[in-house]
A protein has these predicted regions:
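Single conserved hydrophobic/aromatic residue that forms the stacking wall/gate
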Residues: 1-16
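Positively charged, small/polar-rich N-terminal and surface patches that mediate targeting and assembly
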Residues: 17-132
Length: 132
């Protein structure tokens, strides 16, 4: 049944399926934070979130020594950087992060890109592009 309400829901659904914003999440080595931050600022990024995280991938932890004893650290310290950007800026941001974070060694990290349906700035109520 074609009602105004059902058309409105369809519009919301269409907008969600064709999100024009993306969330870029990068897991990097902690000592690369300043390099990545500078690269993002130079790429025009004005805001980011940084979180301390722990994990492992192919690196599978590492052996450490403490007072003569060896033990395995299964989860390695990493940082997660998150930015939400207009879809048109994804390649620039991803390339900036990858270049700045790369050492060429196992454990350099990963970059994940996800669609973002809606952004709301809490203080003003601005939405989507205006909230970025």
């Amino acid at each position: 049944r074609d009602t105004e309400a059902s058309r409105g829901l369809g519009d919301v659904y269409k907008r969600q399926r064709s999100a024009v914003m993306k969330k870029v999440e990068a897991i990097i080595r902690p000592f690369k934070l300043e390099d990545v931050k500078l690269a993002l600022v130079n790429a025009g990024i004005v805001g980011m979130t940084v979180s301390e995280v722990r994990g492992f991938g192919r690196q599978k932890g590492q052996v450490e020594r403490y007072r003569g004893s060896e033990f395995t650290v299964e989860f390695l310290q990493k940082l997660k950087i998150e930015v939400v950007i207009d879809d048109s800026r994804v390649d620039t941001v991803v390339n900036s992060i990858a270049e700045a974070a790369k050492t060429g060694e196992i454990g350099d990290g990963k970059i994940f890109i996800s669609p973002v349906d809606t952004v709301v700035r809490i203080r003003t109520g601005d939405r989507d592009g205006a909230a970025l």
